[in-house]
Amino acid sequence: MTTHNTGIEDQTSIKPLRLALRGTDLLRSEIYNKGSAFTERERDEFGLRGRLPFTVNTLEQQLERAYDQYQNRKSDIRKNSFLQSLKVQNQVLFYNLLTKHLEEMADAIAEYSHLFRQPEGLYISPPSVEKMEEDFLEACAGRELDLGSGGIGISSAKAVIYSLVAGIDPARTLAVVLDVGTNNPELRNDELYLGWNHDRVRGEEYDSFVDKFAKLVVTHQPQCLLHFEDFGVSNAQKLLDRYATKQAVFNDDIQGTGAVTLATLTSALQVTQSKLSDQRIIQFGAGSAGLGIARQIRDAMVLVDGTDPKVAAEKFWLVDKNGLLKKGLGDKIRSDIEEDFIRKEDDWGANDETHLLDVVKKVKPTVLIGTSTAKGAFTEDVIREMAKHTEQPIIFPLSNPTRLAECTPEDAQKWTNGKALVSTGSPFPPVDLGNGKKYTVAECNNALVYPGIGLGAIVSRAKRVTDKMIIRAAQVLGEMGPASADKPEASLLPDFADSQKVAVAIALEVMDQAIREGVADFDDKALLHDKDARKIYLESKLWKPEYREYVYDPDGRK
């Protein structure tokens, strides 16, 4: 978020931009470059006349040419390479192309973590810890951040989604990698490895290093949303707990995965017409994602249905490679797993088997969620046993990529006679149910939820991202799913092609929730009491991939 009282720049009344860049420097700036769309006046003023072809193009003409070039790339790799190249040349054209062809390019966009690996953003390592503030300020020079995130490769991709889906100005985002070393022997022995070639830092030194970075964000970009990405299972929840009450932070691996799964479950319950707190849920896989999902759904039971927290936790049975998490496992259970999620030994008996099929037989779950990366773990026996005891089994094999899914949607439907409500962690084609019907498989993709949460937090200038804000976002997304009791074969989630509309709807409700909890900080206090005005205000803040008029100013932006 911006650090000025005026907030994010109003996109409905944009004045000409004053730039100090000229000539080749301007053409090399992916943020300000217009390529052949620079006007005659701008070419004269910025020393570009001899550097560009004669004809001045419109953005629409450039878009047509770029789309032709994209289509002429026959393989996915070449298409992705073209998009990568375009992004580092001309961001307005890049985002415009994706926006205009969102449905066609949806799969590629949703998998951006595999596309963009450019050396962009800020790299921070322990050996340069004393220079951390200097490096951070240099990276932020002349920029007011809305968004900062950790981990260059995937976080650069997440920033793209924030801009494309939620209208966050890409110039106001900063991808950051906190490079704390690696224990990967292949990387350590690679002479060309570019990271810090050192044993992975842990314990107090690690905590101090991350803490210093987080404090820099609070000090110098106090209204920036800090998006944590790809922090290991032992650190993710610990860091979220540490900073969640101090600043606006969001951990996508925990909260994003939890929120989109809660949204998908909310949609499924609209089909079954049952309450969240009435479910019996087996969570197969108790890593950061699985535990994040269990916590998110439990918290929703508490906040939405008014269930006692302890009773809500007892609606879950967590299973991992050691079997059901019960007290007898002792130190095989991670220390960050709450006591309420661990089953009592007396409930099972000393000789009871507690692996997945046995747990399914005893629990008779209504919901089965997989985050185990154990391919095929939801076997025919498991699914058929579940289907014996519930009319419409809710089955979410969320492990990705596709080859690691706990089961395929086709098998889930076959083993339940077409009654299952299925969502996956990777794209799957529709399943033929017979009788002329096809089941549309919802992809439980975080990209449908975190852009709207971030946008709502940024525009409301939220001091924190609260649990209720995230739960409300999940409810909104779930309510937008096409599936219903009358049409159970429809997708449980909106199509990614509708993600921009989804983000705005989520953001509005997140803003409302921020107001209800007293964490919003609008300059115009009238916005606190007028939802229609907030909608207009939100829409005025959305960055759009359009060219602005430039005026040369030696003291302008560089």
Question: Language-model segments: which ranges?
Answer:
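N-terminal ligand-binding/catalytic initiation module
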Residues: 2-247, 535, 541-556
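Adenosine-phosphate binding glycine-rich loop
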Residues: 32-33, 250-256, 269-272, 393, ...
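Generic secondary-structure signature for well-ordered alpha-helical cores
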Residues: 44, 48-51, 114-117, 167-171, ...
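Short acidic, glycine/serine/threonine-rich loops at helix termini
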Residues: 137, 146-153, 187-192, 236-242, ...
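Flexible, glycine/charged-enriched surface loops at secondary-structure junctions
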Residues: 171-173, 223-229, 275-279, 304-314, ...
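Glycine-rich phosphate/diphosphate-binding loop of Rossmann-like nucleotide-binding domains
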Residues: 246, 251-367
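Long hydrophobic segments that form regular secondary structure
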Residues: 352-418, 446, 461
